[in-house]
Design a protein with these regions (language model features):
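Extracytoplasmic small-molecule ligand-binding "clamshell" domains
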Residues: 21-97, 105
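Short beta-strand-to-loop elements that line the ligand-binding cleft
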Residues: 71-78, 145, 162-170
């Protein structure tokens, strides 16, 4: 199962020293800056009616700021820049970041507070054509991914024979499936369960989630 982690700036200095310095900086400024993509339902979404961020990650960060006695400011970012925004000092922390060896070289991670599996989504009308993960691993199949996400790397691992199509945010990979420009995409089981409700023409390939 994938782990949702709070990503904290520790840079390349000794972790304990740099973490303490960052904490003191946040407490001194009275502000916790949080990078969020606002495109991952139900963790972080931007409500068009209020122009405010909502979701589980948002609730966690608001409670963290409250416990620290500081205000929280949400900074918009993209998946491809979610780590560089921390190392450049644009914001202090980010959420819903999958831990990878590359990311761990430049940033620190807390313990996970949520776990999920990875599942494929296809058009419901194509479920008989694509009943399994392996049925999507075909040179005639196009798999859409969102640039900079962990799913982009996982798609290369899971579907080495398929054609991969990386989409720049704010566009999303599932939109390529809806439009027919891609046969499938992979996402967290959490988001997948929300997407099939919002877009009933989508369906989850049911032969099991992967890590």
């Amino acid at each position: 199962m994938k782990k949702i982690l709070l990503l904290v700036l520790l840079a390349l200095l000794p972790f304990s020293v740099n973490a303490e310095s960052k904490l003191n900086q946040i407490l001194s400024s009275g502000e916790l800056k949080v990078g969020t993509t606002g495109d991952w339902d139900p963790m972080s979404m931007k409500d068009p009616a209020t122009n405010k961020y909502v979701g589980f990650d948002i609730d966690v960060m608001e409670e963290l700021a409250k416990d620290m006695g500081v205000k929280v400011t949400f900074i918009p970012t993209e998946w491809k820049t979610i780590v560089s925004g921390i190392t450049s000092g644009r914001y202090d922390v980010s959420t819903s970041v999958t831990k990878t060896a590359k990311r761990a070289l430049v940033a620190g991670f807390t313990n996970s507070y949520y776990k999920y599996g990875t599942v494929p989504l296809v058009l419901k009308k194509n479920l008989k054509k694509f009943p399994t993960w392996e049925s999507l691993n075909n040179e005639k199949v196009t798999i859409a991914t969102t640039l900079g996400t962990s799913q982009e790397e996982k798609a290369k691992e899971f579907f080495p024979k398929s054609k991969l199509k990386s989409i720049e945010s704010p566009a999303r990979d599932f939109q390529e499936v809806l439009s027919g420009r891609a046969d499938g995409h992979i996402t967290s089981s959490t988001e997948a369960n929300k997407l099939v409700i919002t877009y009933p023409q989508l369906a989850i390939v049911k032969d099991g989630g992967k890590n």
